[in-house]
Amino acid sequence: RGLGDVYKRQVYDQMVLEKAGLNLAGVVRAEGETFRWAGKYEGAMESVETLSTEVNVLGDFKPILPEVWANPQVLFCASTHPASQLAVLDQCPRAQLTVLDTFMLWIDTEFETLSEAMRKVDVVVINEQEVCSIAGDEILLRAMKSIISGEALHGGSGAGPGPRCLIAKRGSGGVLAMLPFGTLAMPAYPTSEIIDPTGCGDSFAGSFLAYLAGRPGVLTDIEAIRNALVHATVTSSFTLEGIGTSEIASIDRGSYHARVDRYRRIVGIK
């Protein structure tokens, strides 16, 4: 993704990512302001009102991937402009598992392009509000089916089916995953330390895919998907308990695996 010119923040972000051992070869610095989003959470932090979205440098960003990234096991297109997502997908035709996230701005303003991108990926990971908005249906299960069939996307089912799998994040309601072998429902990890839900979706998707990386044929492997959802749920529960990335950036393996074990007992998974 592109980074704006808020230099001190860039340096800090780069240090955090490098410390985590991530390959930053594809990160580009561009002149201009960094993408900014502002929102307001209310009540039990379940509903969010977007106050402003400033695309800034990402508006004209043309992603060009390093050659070493051309054949990834897992390709995750985070919630940037759908045209950028399509550009990345086109550069990785041999990716083994392709996944997409989005948010309301693109649903409202770039639905045709977003629909094209959703039809090209294996998995879409979005929240319940976004699923229902795309489908124009408040019944979640029905809305999910219409997205997978392609009926809810631009052009309808005649333009082709949607993603093979759809995962709906439901906040304290847990997660509902519609997959080729059926549907999985899992609860949220119970916590009273609700500080900042921002970024929970990103950490959910990232940890879900990190578990699946290197496991061929995962979309038909119910145990692999269930275990990936365990890790996704636990990771996002840590994100919820701090501001931004503060909590997951400082977590230790012992605390993480203790929570994974606790959650497994809650949901009855050995």
Regions inferred by a protein language model and the residue ranges of each:
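Redox-cofactor binding/interface segments in oxidoreductases and associated redox assembly factors
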Residues: L75-C77, L100, I126
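Short beta->alpha connector loops
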Residues: R9, S79-S84, F103-I107
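A short acidic, amphipathic alpha-helical/loop segment
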Residues: V16, S84-Q91, E112-E116
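Short, small-residue-biased leader/transition segments that mark boundaries at the very start
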Residues: G2-Y7
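Conserved phosphate/ATP/ADP-binding segment of small-molecule kinases
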Residues: P93-L97, M104-P187, E193, I222
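Conserved phosphate-binding/catalytic loop of the ribokinase/pfkB sugar-kinase fold
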Residues: K40-L86
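Conserved post-catalytic alpha-helical subdomain immediately downstream of the catalytic base
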Residues: Y189-R262, I266-I269
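A glycine-rich helix N-cap at a beta->alpha junction
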Residues: V16-F35
